């Protein structure tokens, strides 16, 4: 779901105008557009009087696919899925549908979005490789700086300026700060890392997608793999 809702930030100009979800699916099959390509298409829903209405939007192909499985209700807007959908955001979408459409429509929606998610997760082929774990360039400098500071604490302790307990607390504190800084630097680099494929597709780092979406893993686990221990 996260992958489907991603947006190509550099893609400013729409790559086509489509009058139906079938046309979008055909274009995806032909590879004339990608899931993350900006396009112009329509969102069919109903108004407060129960009459069918058609709204035009500029968004990604993936988000139009997500909008297609939304229940028809005047309170369920296209904006509900017109954003990057993390695990938390998907929960909010389900909650909104439950409040306005009831249990039956919510169950149907969950089943549809599950099928859509599995289908495109399979097609995306997102995997976990060692090259996806990016060690921050600043790691060595941060660690060496921390070690120098610890040497200073050792000197202060030897000179009787601080107690053993104070030295211990200072060492723990500075290693904790170093760990957090390395983790933040790693997340900054991994979030901007991209893969460019032979067909000119540009994909976000797989490990970052897994953690940021809330599907699997966390920043703390990534910190251990590519930050302090890795």
Model feature map: region roles:
Residues 165-226:
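Gly/Pro-rich turn-and-neighbor structural signature
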Residues 1-165, 221-230:
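Feature marking long nucleic-acid-engaging regions of large polymerase/nuclease enzymes
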